[in-house]
């Protein structure tokens, strides 16, 4: 069988070389600690450049400014940071030992993701690329579950794990948001409207 992980996001979780969390996860748009970093990045790059590069404006939802906040305000944590993960990629790492992230989630890491080339591309010098996970598509197989994860979870050693994605993307797919014009409203701790449009 296969396991697919979907968890809250986008968020930021710095981990050390063993994959252990160095601090509590920094949540999505409800966490506004990186307000100054958003302003600074918009001043240095121009909002239109950021939007064209990553497909999103910088907001409290964006992970890139939060990484910059971490560097500026918690250098002790930043110094130990091996990878920057999300809740989904943290769980996938616990299951497989591999650091991966799906493209949909990566697009929320502005200004670190190039939406046209579909790759990491830090146009602002916010984060060394080696600290970011390998990019995959959410349905790609990352690999088999590790023996220790099988023991912890009770899953079979024959289980494979997909890259997975964040909660909103999984929910959109589950309710049929697949074509231009489709949309959904997601109610949770916050409310999101997700709509597919046929434009770039």
Can you describe what each PLM-predicted range is?
Residues 16-25, 75, 123, 178, ...:
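A glycine- and small-aliphatic-rich helix-loop capping segment at beta-alpha/alpha-beta transitions
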Residues 15, 50-166:
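Gly/Ser/Thr-rich active-site cleft segment
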Residues 7-8, 87-89, 189:
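Short, well-ordered beta-to-alpha junction loops that form the rim of enzyme active sites
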Residues 38, 121, 145-146, 174, ...:
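Short helix/loop capping segments that flank catalytic or ligand/cofactor-binding pockets
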Residues 1-64:
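Active-site phosphate-binding/coordination module
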Residues 11, 34-36, 61-65, 107-111, ...:
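Conserved A3 ("GATE") glycine/threonine-rich loop of ANL adenylate-forming enzymes
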């Amino acid at each position: 069988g296969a396991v697919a992980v979907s968890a809250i996001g986008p968020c930021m979780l710095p981990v050390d070389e063993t994959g252990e969390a160095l601090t509590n996860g920094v949540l999505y748009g409800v966490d506004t600690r990186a307000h100054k970093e958003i302003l600074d990045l918009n001043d240095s790059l121009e909002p239109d450049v950021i939007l064209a590069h990553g497909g999103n404006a910088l907001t409290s939802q964006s992970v890139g400014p939060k990484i910059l906040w971490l560097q500026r305000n918690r250098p002790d944590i930043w110094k130990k940071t091996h990878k920057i993960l999300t809740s989904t990629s943290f769980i996938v790492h616990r299951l497989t030992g591999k650091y991966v992230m799906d493209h949909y989630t990566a697009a929320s890491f502005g200004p670190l993701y190039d939406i046209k080339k579909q790759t990491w591309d830090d146009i602002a010098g916010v984060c060394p690329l080696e600290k970011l996970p390998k990019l995959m598509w959410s349905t790609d197989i990352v690999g088999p579950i590790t023996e220790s994860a099988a023991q912890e979870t009770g899953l079979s050693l024959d289980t494979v794990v997909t890259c997975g994605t964040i909660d909103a993307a999984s929910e959109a797919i589950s309710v049929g948001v697949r074509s231009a014009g489709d949309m959904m409203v997601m109610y949770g701790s916050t409310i999101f409207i997700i709509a597919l449009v046929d434009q770039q």
